[in-house]
Design a protein with these regions (language model features):
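NAD(P)H-binding glycine-rich loop region in Rossmannoid oxidoreductase-like domains
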Residues: 47-88, 96
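Conserved Rossmann-fold NAD(P)-dependent oxidoreductase catalytic core, especially the SDR/UDP-sugar
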Residues: 92-136
Length: 337
């Protein structure tokens, strides 16, 4: 990728920012597109959205490759907004990228595009199914992935990667939510907590995405799931996150039907009273927390020529170290006041 310029959309997010930083560290010039400054030193920020034609076209001008992560990622919200950002924004970005002469395009998707509510055990990257996907995010990401793969052509190669449950130090989503809710005694385990779940440590997710970009002559027109390949019981994983942060792990179990019913009620309440916060439970979340999600990674490893370098155990060591360092730094700050 030396000498090429790469656009990363959604670089103010956890994964997008890490992708942009990794490219810059490798000597690749990076431009970003998102609503607010990316915070990535050395990146050229274009402030805007994929739904705005002016900022979108400015972002792709003179670009060789695109890594598209920008999306509306919430459990609830206006279906029209999900469609505008995730589907129509992707459609327009693909068209503008092709018109600007972009030759490689990586669409960062999600395994939820092929999740129909039942356990996934050892499957590969099944085709995205918008009509069967669960929730507006999954439905619109599935539709967007189909658009992206349909745009694959000799002039612009397109591939899709689906990192699953990305986590690590500084993660504002999975780890932060688990730890925050556990610290308040609001993190019950749905079902037995024994459902096996694959995850992807942040550095491994970044490496996998960049491998898909490097190997796009092989990966174009196809979708790939990215995970550590080390499924763990979800209760064990959540407990490990909590212990790393010095928080008591969850011990209360809630039956799946109860969690689903609570989720259905919460969805109605949040539609009536929309706000910036997320509901404590949704039907989609209840399914995600009670069903297995682990994947066959053999095709991913072969086609991307990639293996996760960190994995779960080393990732947890790094998470513990990061929390320990943050605690020491906070204590030093208190003493200095």
């Amino acid at each position: 990728m030396t000498g090429e310029r790469v656009l990363v959309t959604g670089a103010s997010g956890y994964l997008g920012g890490a992708v942009a930083a990794a490219l810059l560290a490798a000597g690749v010039p990076v431009r970003t597109l998102q609503r607010r400054p990316s915070g990535v030193p050395g990146a050229e920020d274009v402030l805007g959205t994929v739904t705005d034609p002016a900022s979108r076209r400015a972002a792709v001008e003179g670009i060789d490759a695109v890594v598209h992560l920008a999306a509306k990622v919430t459990f609830t919200g206006d279906p029209a907004e999900f469609a505008a950002v995730n589907v129509e924004g992707t459609r327009a970005l693909l068209a503008d990228a092709a018109a600007a002469g972009v030759t490689r395009f990586v669409f960062v998707s999600s395994p939820s595009v092929a999740h129909t509510g039942t356990s996934i055990m050892g499957d590969g990257a099944a085709p995205a199914e918008p009509s069967r996907a669960r929730g507006e995010y999954a439905r619109t990401k599935a539709a967007a992935e189909l658009l992206a793969l349909a745009a694959d052509s000799p002039s612009m190669a397109v591939t899709a990667v689906r990192p699953h449950l990305v986590w690590g130090p500084g993660d504002p989503q999975l780890v932060a939510r688990v730890v925050d809710r556990a610290s308040k005694g609001r993190l019950p385990l749905v079902g037995t907590g024994a459902a096996l779940v694959d995850t992807c440590y942040i550095d491994d997710a970044v490496d996998g995405i960049l491998a898909a970009l490097r190997r796009i002559d092989v990966t174009h027109g196809q979708a790939y799931v990215l995970t550590s390949g080390e499924p763990r019981p979800i209760g064990e994983l959540f407990s490990a996150f909590c212990r790393a942060a010095g928080v008591r792990p969850p011990a209360v179990h809630v039956p799946v039907p109860v969690a689903s019913a609570v989720g259905a009620i919460a969805e109605v309440v949040w539609r009536i009273r929309p706000g910036d916060d997320e509901p404590p439970m949704t039907r989609f979340l209840a399914e995600q927390l009670s069903t297995a999600h682990w994947f066959d990674q053999r095709r991913t490893h072969e086609d991307l020529d990639w293996r996760p370098a960190v994995g779960v155990s080393r990732g947890l060591e790094r998470l513990r170290a990061a929390h320990r360092d943050a605690t020491v730094a906070a204590g030093a700050g208190d003493l200095a006041e």
